[in-house]
């Protein structure tokens, strides 16, 4: 099984941004732990602060990943284009926060 994780704006600052709210662990540390705990799953990870790059990544992996876990950050509330990209691909997309 292949699971792709996509994080949107400001999620590159996890571990640094408001640690009292979001914790002090970087996403890369969490991602490395996830790969160790589930070695039978192929994980890949992408993060961007740019809406178009998130859409390009959805198009790129949206026909090969079994599941996409998407935390689009603030774009969850504002991006019609990301919603359209999700509708255009075959992979299952689960929105996470």
Predicted features along the sequence, with ranges:
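Short beta->alpha junction loops
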Residues: 44-52
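Short, well-structured alpha-helical segments in soluble
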Residues: 56-64
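A generic structural motif
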Residues: 39-43
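Short acidic active-site motifs
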Residues: 53-57, 78
